[in-house]
Amino acid sequence: MDVSKAVDQRISTRAFLPDPLPEAEVREWLTQAQRAPSGGNVQPWRTIAVTGQAKDDVIAMAAPILAADPRGQKTDRPIYPKDLWEPYEARRRRVGEMMYEALDIPREDRAARLAWFSNNFRFFGAPLALFLVIDERMGHGQWGHAGMYLQTLALLAEERGWGTCFQECWGCLLYTSDA
């Protein structure tokens, strides 16, 4: 598969087969992604992969937090800037509307929307979850390099026929937990 095709067909996958990915292939994928651009070769990211029981433990850790607030806890690191401005807010709302329309969940059915949203905290059934960690002291450039690493992971996953879904929502739990 060429890069253009991988870019064109990559989507956020929200339904996964339960089959585990071969560990050797996962290691190869993660190693290859380390070739992502990084100024000064700083590679400011750390990737934590969880599968099997470890993944189940992470999901279980999230359960009591989500029982208190299905959207996660409030943090000083919101997913979106406060009072997101146009045209960004319209884009964000439209993609949400399209997703819930495709799922046949009406706008007024808040309970069904929150139930669907809670699938984020079960990784949509994916057999592998990755957490990207970066030291907060890193500058804007290094955060950008981490983004290039994530894009590289996504495109290499697409090449392998693996779906991906980037989930910032976990930050609402992990920044405020002992995880």
Region locations from a protein language model:
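Conserved small/polar residues in nucleotide/adenosyl-binding loops
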Residues: 175-179
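Extracellular/periplasmic catalytic domains that process cell-envelope and extracellular macromolecules
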Residues: 122-125
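Small-aliphatic-rich amphipathic alpha-helix that forms the alpha element of a beta-alpha
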Residues: 29-35, 128-174
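N-terminal amphipathic, basic helical "cap/leader" segment at the start of enzyme domains
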Residues: 1-120
